[in-house]
């Protein structure tokens, strides 16, 4: 099949397949990828928790470093991916290659800078991310290999997102799932079999992510994608580079503020000891696993929304957003019901310490209610980002952490003590949902109006 034939087949699939079937077909491998990623994060928490409470706290500290890596990768991946998908929707394959190449090589450069700066200032960097003196040794050992692999990890996120936005979620899944399963297998081998302790968890993560990078790169080099990587295709136009940054600004804002929020959460919790840092870290990892289902469904929405918006099929964008909202909510209800009845056992699975459980259990129960509001937040943000509404998407992406969580974590612990630390995240989720909902409802109405205008061949602008 020629490149032109593959492009035509992909266009027909993205613009003609019934919305529920299309989203579920794209979401299923993405959900699996997200779950595997969350499982290997949980595996790190589980195995490191076998060492000590201080080592378990190091997982929470290094998760802020991972959020920085994800912020850079998602900024370039989502930023280029939304443009690539819309350009493919309008059948401009040359532009797709240009934006893909620019984001990939920029990711490598950003990763090198992060690795050099992070390794040169490692102890201070870990303290900045919320480490205590007793956690510091574990945090540095865990973070060092991850920083060395940062260029490949950021580039992998870019490739994964480009594949998804092209509608090739199955290919993206292969790289991520392979890396995740390897991470789970290598954790106990390096940590306990080779006696490397916390450093072994970092080495396992770095090695598995390097292999994932190789698999994803193979997909592009073997011509399995429409867009390609060529150094000669990197844009020389500052305007196009700024388009990538603008399109990825919501992801960068969301993940960057996640890192800052995680740092402030660690700092607030460390006032109550290593058990508090470990307890909040465990709760965060468990709920990241649950939330990965909603995010996975939302990522199934993104290429559908981008592609059909570029093809001016606005009714399909609207249908996709509504279906995703319903599907994500239904899945979360089932997961929360299971977790609610096994809450204490889940927490003890990661660290069987009464002090850790005493901190984590109330936070876990508060979060069970708040996470049911996440589908509104996820669908609103991902829809705006997918159709190129960078301003609204950036505001909403930054809203949860920047507008809601960070002010709360600075104030509530001073007023309510440890309970304030535990309540910050669920309150932030509730506030963000109430802010997001009017944006979503208004945009759904606008899509309906644009579709009517398109049907009558009248120009439609938002």
Predicted regions and their residues:
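Short alpha-helical transmembrane segments in multi-pass integral membrane proteins
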Residues: 1-27, 84-151, 193-249, 305-370, ...
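Small-residue-rich hydrophobic transmembrane alpha-helices
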Residues: 56-116, 153-172, 279-343, 374-396
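Short runs within selected transmembrane alpha-helices of multi-pass transporters and secretion channels
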Residues: 77, 146-164, 172-180, 201-216, ...
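Transmembrane helical elements of multi-pass membrane transporters/channels
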Residues: 25-44, 145, 179, 208-212, ...
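Hydrophobic transmembrane alpha-helices of multi-pass small-molecule transporters
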Residues: 68-71, 183-188, 213-217, 289-292, ...
């Amino acid at each position: 099949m020629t490149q032109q034939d593959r492009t035509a087949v992909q266009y027909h699939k993205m613009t003609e397949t019934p919305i529920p079937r299309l989203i579920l077909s794209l979401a299923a491998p993405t959900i699996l990828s997200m779950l595997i990623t969350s499982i290997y994060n949980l595996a790190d928490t589980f195995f490191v928790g076998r060492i000590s409470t201080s080592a378990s706290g190091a997982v929470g500290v290094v998760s802020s470093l991972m959020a920085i890596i994800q912020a850079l990768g998602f900024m370039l991946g989502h930023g280029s991916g939304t443009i690539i998908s819309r350009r493919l929707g309008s059948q401009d394959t040359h532009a797709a290659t240009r934006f893909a190449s620019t984001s990939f090589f920029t990711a490598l450069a950003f990763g090198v800078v992060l690795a050099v700066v992070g390794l040169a200032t490692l102890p201070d960097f870990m303290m900045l991310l919320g480490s205590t003196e007793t956690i510091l040794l574990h945090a540095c050992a865990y973070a060092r290999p991850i920083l060395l692999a940062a260029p490949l990890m950021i580039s992998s996120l870019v490739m994964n997102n480009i594949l998804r936005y092209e509608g090739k979620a199955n290919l993206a899944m292969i790289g991520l799932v392979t890396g995740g399963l390897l991470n789970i297998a290598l954790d106990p081998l390096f940590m306990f079999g080779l006696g490397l302790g916390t450093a072994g968890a970092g080495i396992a993560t770095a090695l598995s992510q390097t292999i994932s990078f190789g698999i994803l790169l193979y997909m592009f080099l073997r011509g399995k994608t429409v867009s390609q990587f060529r150094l000669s295709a990197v844009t020389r136009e500052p305007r196009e580079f700024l388009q990538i940054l603008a399109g990825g600004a919501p992801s960068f804002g969301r993940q960057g503020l996640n890192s800052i929020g995680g740092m402030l959460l660690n700092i607030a919790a460390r006032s109550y000891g290593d058990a508090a840092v470990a307890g909040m870290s465990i709760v965060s990892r468990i709920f990241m696993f649950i939330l990965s289902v909603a995010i996975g469904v939302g990522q199934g929405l993104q290429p559908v929304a981008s592609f059909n918006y570029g093809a001016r099929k606005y009714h399909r964008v609207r249908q996709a957003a509504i279906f995703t909202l319903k599907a994500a909510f239904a899945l979360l209800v089932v997961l929360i019901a299971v977790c609610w009845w096994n809450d204490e056992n889940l927490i003890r699975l990661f660290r069987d310490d009464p002090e850790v459980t005493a901190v984590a259990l109330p936070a876990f129960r508060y979060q069970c209610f708040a996470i049911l509001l996440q589908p509104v937040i996820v669908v609103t943000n991902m829809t705006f980002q997918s159709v190129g509404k960078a301003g609204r998407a950036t505001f909403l992406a930054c809203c949860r952490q920047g507008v809601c969580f960070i002010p709360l974590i600075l104030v509530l612990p001073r007023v309510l003590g440890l309970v304030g630390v535990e309540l910050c995240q669920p309150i932030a989720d509730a506030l963000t949902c109430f802010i997001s909902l009017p944006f979503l409802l208004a945009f759904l109405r606008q899509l309906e109006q644009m579709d009517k205008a398109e049907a009558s061949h009248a120009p439609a602008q938002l």
